[in-house]
């Protein structure tokens, strides 16, 4: 007697080929950008080891008992260590911000698979060189600043590439919720980076950089062999291409000018026999200033500048703040800081789901930003009063801080990059993503740098800066919120009239 088909095989047969490939792309791009964030996290964990209070440790025989910095790593052993550590953050984030504006342009003009895989391998090399400074006993500040700059430039290859790849494979339906789940790679990468770096920080902090560097380079090789840029390359159906959509695209007029092609419509040509045939040209890549003219790009870019300032200040300085304020060792502080990223996962999914349900991205971001300001104030005064309080406050702050940041960098960027004014030109996606994330990266560079200066005067000043930045982010969305409220009220009046 022959048995029925195995359940797993029946399940595989029930899943379409398109769904399999799309699931594969989601998992791949998730893992790739997880590696990017994992490789940039170790510096925040290692900070607590580069400068330590050595008075509580037994000193070697040749060290004076009055020397409280003998266990620190030069040149970070002096009282200006916060400024020096801040300069490492600034070097990385400024180069990242500058490089991001050009990365989207290159990403649209180079093969995506080569660009992404090459960037990941280079990131792995530069990250590892930071750790090799430990084994080569390098104490020159310029060495660490140099590789922070190079790594910052290499890291810009990641975000525009993975967002463009996702945009090539997925349409707009439930984009906020899907992107909210997918964007948890940021928090997952931060958590993995913290745990991996924390495992080595107290014994050999060089491995805190080298191990993540090897991992991202290995995934870069995997990317080269397996990434599929477009559904058409493997015979899958491209997103948003039902018959009615195709007909609508054929009816769209040409929309371009002499300096900036937004879209090229379908053209009809005649062959030698006189028969007309339709030929769809590939749309040209949009220019930088053309992308800025897309409605909403400027507002969300400036909003992200301040939102990312807050998020990245937590990313780079939270472990040190916990270690100094609550007297945890570097490993425990790094482990505890991952709770902020856990909250970030929840916040990204929550913001995406609310945005999908309401269709109001600006209102969703603004409400979460409004709630963030008082929560930061409360955390500053109550956050370290007990372990349970710290855990709760870190998760809540992670939800509110990273929710808007996640929504803007994923679903909002993808929506603006495929805005109706572009008339189907998907070439704008990488450039729009790079503009929005590049603007945010300016804030990401400013936040940790200012925190390095202000923290020497007291952590209160750092939190005042974060609250001010959060308020600025809210104000920059006022015009878009007003438009969304008018649309919402208009829809309610229409429904009331129809009743």
Curated annotation (Swiss-Prot):
GO MF assignments: glucose 6-phosphate:phosphate antiporter activity
The record lists glycosylation at 53, 62, 66
Show the CDD domains listed in the entry.
MFS_SLC37A1_2
- What membrane topology does the annotation report for this chain? Multi-pass membrane protein
In Gene Ontology terms, what is a biological process of this protein? phosphate ion transmembrane transport
Q: Name one GO cellular component term.
A: endoplasmic reticulum membrane
SUPFAM superfamilies given for it? Answer: MFS general substrate transporter
Q: Pfam families, from UniProt?
A: MFS_1
Catalytic activity from the UniProt record: D-glucose 6-phosphate(in) + phosphate(out) = D-glucose 6-phosphate(out) + phosphate(in)
Going by the UniProt record, its keywords in alphabetical order are:
Antiport, Endoplasmic reticulum, Glycoprotein, Membrane, Sugar transport, Transmembrane, Transmembrane helix, Transport
Q: What is its main location?
A: endoplasmic reticulum
Q: List the disulfide bonds.
A: none
- Membrane spanning residue stretches: 21-40, 86-106, 116-136, 138-158, 187-207, 208-228, 302-322, 334-354, 362-382, 391-411, 434-454, 458-478
Cellular location of this protein? Endoplasmic reticulum membrane
Family assignment from sequence similarity: Belongs to the major facilitator superfamily. Organophosphate:Pi antiporter (OPA) (TC 2.A.1.4) family.
Summarizing the function annotation, the protein's role is:
Inorganic phosphate and glucose-6-phosphate antiporter. May transport cytoplasmic glucose-6-phosphate into the lumen of the endoplasmic reticulum and translocate inorganic phosphate into the opposite direction.
Give the protein's recorded name. Answer: Glucose-6-phosphate exchanger SLC37A2
Q: Which organism is it from?
A: Xenopus tropicalis
């Amino acid at each position: 007697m022959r048995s029925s088909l195995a359940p797993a095989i029946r399940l595989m047969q029930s899943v379409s080929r398109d769904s399999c490939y799309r699931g594969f792309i989601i998992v791949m791009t998730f893992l790739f950008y997880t590696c990017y964030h994992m490789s940039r996290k170790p510096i925040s964990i290692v900070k607590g080891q580069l400068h330590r209070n050595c008075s509580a440790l037994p000193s070697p025989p040749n060290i004076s008992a009055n020397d409280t910095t003998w266990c620190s790593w030069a040149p970070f052993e002096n009282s200006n260590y916060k400024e020096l550590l801040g300069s490492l953050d600034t070097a990385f984030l400024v180069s990242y911000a500058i490089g991001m504006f050009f990365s989207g342009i290159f990403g649209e003009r180079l093969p995506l698979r080569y660009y992404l895989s090459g960037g990941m391998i280079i990131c792995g090399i530069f990250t590892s060189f930071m750790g090799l400074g430990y084994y080569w006993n390098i104490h020159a500040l310029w060495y660490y600043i140099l590789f922070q700059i190079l790594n910052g430039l290499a890291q810009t290859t990641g975000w525009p590439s993975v967002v463009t790849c996702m945009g090539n494979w997925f349409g707009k339906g439930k984009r906020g919720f899907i992107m909210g789940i997918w964007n948890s790679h940021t928090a997952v990468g931060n958590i993995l980076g913290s745990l991996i770096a924390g495992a080595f920080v107290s014994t050999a902090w060089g491995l805190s950089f080298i191990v993540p560097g090897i991992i991202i380079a290995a995934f870069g090789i995997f990317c080269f062999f397996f990434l599929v840029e477009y559904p058409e390359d493997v015979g899958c159906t491209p997103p948003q291409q039902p018959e009615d959509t195709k007909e609508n695209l054929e009816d769209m007029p040409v929309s371009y000018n002499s300096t900036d092609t937004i879209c090229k419509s379908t053209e009809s040509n005649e062959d030698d026999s006189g028969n007309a045939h339709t030929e769809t040209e590939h749309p040209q890549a949009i220019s930088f200033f053309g992308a800025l003219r897309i409605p909403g790009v400027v507002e969300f870019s400036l909003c992200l500048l301040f939102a990312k300032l807050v998020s990245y200040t937590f990313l780079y300085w939270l472990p040190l703040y916990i270690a100094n304020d609550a007297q945890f060792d570097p490993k425990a502080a790094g482990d505890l800081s991952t709770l902020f990223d856990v909250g970030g996962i929840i916040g990204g999914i929550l913001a995406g789901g609310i945005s999908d349900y309401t269709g109001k991205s600006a209102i969703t971001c603004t409400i979460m930003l409004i709630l963030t300001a008082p929560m930061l104030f409360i955390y500053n005064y109550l956050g370290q009063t007990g372990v349970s309080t710290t855990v709760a406050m870190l998760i809540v702050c992670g939800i509110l801080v990273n929710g808007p940041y996640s929504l803007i960098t994923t679903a909002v960027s993808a929506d603006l990059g495929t805005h109706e004014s572009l008339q189907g030109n998907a070439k704008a996606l990488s450039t729009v993503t790079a503009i929005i994330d590049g603007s945010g990266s300016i804030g990401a560079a400013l936040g940790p740098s200012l925190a390095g200066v202000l923290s020497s005067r007291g952590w209160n000043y750092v939190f005042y800066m974060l609250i001010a930045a959060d308020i600025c982010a809210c104000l920059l969305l006022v015009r878009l919120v007003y438009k969304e409220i008018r649309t919402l009220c208009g829809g309610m009046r229409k429904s009331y009239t129809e009743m």
